[in-house]
Amino acid sequence: MALAKRIIPCLDVDNGRVVKGVQFENIRDAGDPVEIARRYDEQGADEITFLDITASVDNRDTTLHTVERMASQVFIPLTVGGGVRTVQDIRNLLNAGADKVSINTAAVFNPDFVGEAADRFGSQCIVVAIDAKKVSAPGEPGRWEIFTHGGRKPTGLDAVEWAKKMEALGAGEILLTSMDQDGVKSGYDLGVTRAISEALCIPVIASGGVGNLQHLADGILEGKADAVLAASIFHFGEYTVPEAKAYLAARGIVMR
């Protein structure tokens, strides 16, 4: 029996507003996060991911108040990330109503933080977010490098090997964003998505690049992702979550 696949709208939040950019730049306002989250809950989204996109850069904590407001009005699992650096940060977010917490930059600086967090709170609520950029030349086998600080800083780390290490340390899920594809609407980077999905036993969420419903299907059927994340196509009304679920189900994908 195939595990049901998930559709996860993503809210990139900057100063309390949902925004959407292209390749991590050129930001456009999409509205109030709580209102948008409530709409996706009503539409039947499986989960919501809330990323405070400037928290790591500005070195400030994720807005707990927004998370509390969202959690009080949204009744599907909520993953929150951005500026998560300590066990106390995780505890604060879980207490505010997050179901899972996403760790990105802090995992690179201190990989053992992931293990400590998983030991303390359980792997099921620890998501490691990976921002990957293709670094192999045309014709070479695919190689992808990890970037941190909202995609600003290269690390020299190989994305596939890093994902395997995060799984070994206790991450319960990988949120994989292709920086090359982010916001450009030409589909996920299926190469890195498949490489990481096939290397791991834990779920992989594909992110970065959805422009139509076929891209969601490709992420699952070709990228082997367990869940597909999208932002622009839902935020700006091009498609609804029910339309996406119906499209995927019609292609034989088992949906929740």
UniProtKB/Swiss-Prot annotation:
Belongs to the HisA/HisF family. The active site is at D12, D131. One of its GO terms (biological process) is L-histidine biosynthetic process. It is found in: Cytoplasm. It catalyses: 5-[(5-phospho-1-deoxy-D-ribulos-1-ylimino)methylamino]-1-(5-phospho-beta-D-ribosyl)imidazole-4-carboxamide + L-glutamine = D-erythro-1-(imidazol-4-yl)glycerol 3-phosphate + 5-amino-1-(5-phospho-beta-D-ribosyl)imidazole-4-carboxamide + L-glutamate + H(+). Heterodimer of HisH and HisF. It is an enzyme of class 4 (lyase). The gene is hisF. Disulfide bonds: none annotated. IGPS catalyzes the conversion of PRFAR and glutamine to IGP, AICAR and glutamate. The HisF subunit catalyzes the cyclization activity that produces IGP and AICAR from PRFAR using the ammonia provided by the HisH subunit. CDD domains: HisF. GO terms for cellular component: cytoplasm. Pathway: Amino-acid biosynthesis; L-histidine biosynthesis; L-histidine from 5-phospho-alpha-D-ribose 1-diphosphate: step 5/9. This is Imidazole glycerol phosphate synthase subunit HisF. InterPro entries: Aldolase_TIM (IPR013785), His_biosynth (IPR006062), HisF (IPR004651), IGPS_HisA/HisF (IPR050064), RibuloseP-bd_barrel (IPR011060). Keywords: Amino-acid biosynthesis, Cytoplasm, Histidine biosynthesis, Lyase. GO terms for molecular function: imidazoleglycerol-phosphate synthase activity; lyase activity. Its EC number is 4.3.2.10.
